[in-house]
Regions:
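A short SAM/SAH-binding and catalytic strip from SAM-dependent methyltransferases
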Residues: 82-95
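Class I SAM-dependent methyltransferase SAM/SAH-binding core
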Residues: 17-19, 23-72
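A short acidic, Gly/Pro-enriched loop at the edge of an enzyme's catalytic core
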Residues: 71-82
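A short glycine-rich, Lys/Arg-flanked "PGG" loop and its adjoining helix->strand segment in the class I
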Residues: 96-108
Length: 216
């Protein structure tokens, strides 16, 4: 949370849209600093979990949760001061369109923040897979046998069909953001050891989280 706050400097005011909010991690960060947050997701179970967590922490009155498809939002133009997304963009079927939607609904001078990673990097080739397996062996020795979605072959096969699965990012994001009209585009790679706990930092070492930050 502290690391994210460092990177959202200048974007932490006004009306915020959290796209693909999941359990509300990013929504809560903005709510805690006094922003009005609208959080959307297309998964009702995630929204319920996020609302429950927000209520327990006393911030439910600061966040409005909505069931919406990020690729066809019905918000009017120039509505939000900041649009933010964390670990959701790679799942979109039409990511270029999503950047266009974000640009449309942002106010002039508004901020766009996109936290993501090359989540399917281990499947890009044998060399990438080798490094990923090596890290997995280290984790197993340290923490014991574990399972996550990388062990779910059916899920991985579905993810491989997504348009961004084999696209090198954030280079792609930089190109599309420029074409969309965004200005002051910045790309940063986050310090994994500060962003994740020790287990996750090693698990995702081969696919570090990056931040795309830009203004309309």
């Amino acid at each position: 949370e502290a690391l994210i706050k460092q990177h959202i400097n200048g974007c932490q005011k006004g009306k915020i849209l959290d796209v693909g909010c999941g359990t509300g991690f990013i929504s809560l960060i903005f709510a805690k600093i006094g922003c009005e947050v609208i959080a959307i997701d297309n998964n009702i179970a995630m929204l319920k979990a996020a609302a429950k967590i927000s209520e327990e922490l006393g911030f439910l009155n600061k966040i409005t949760f909505m069931l919406k498809d990020a690729e066809s939002m019905d918000f009017t133009d120039n509505t939000f001061d900041t649009v933010v997304s964390r670990h959701a963009f790679w799942l979109f079927n039409n990511p270029k369109k999503v950047y266009g939607e974000w640009y449309r609904i942002l106010k002039s001078g508004g901020c766009m923040l996109n936290l993501d990673a090359n989540w399917l990097f281990p499947f890009w080739g044998e060399e990438q897979a080798k490094h990923f397996r090596s890290d997995e062996d280290i984790l197993t020795k340290r923490y014991g046998t574990f399972r996550d979605y990388y062990h779910d072959k059916d899920m991985m096969n579905e993810f491989k069909k997504l348009p961004l699965s084999y696209i090198k990012r954030p280079e792609w994001d930089l190109k599309i953001c420029k074409e969309t009209g965004f200005k002051e585009i910045e790309i940063e790679t986050l310090a994994q050891e500060k962003y994740w706990n020790s287990f996750m930092a090693l698990r995702y070492r081969t696919m570090p989280t990056f931040l795309v930050k830009a203004k309309k």
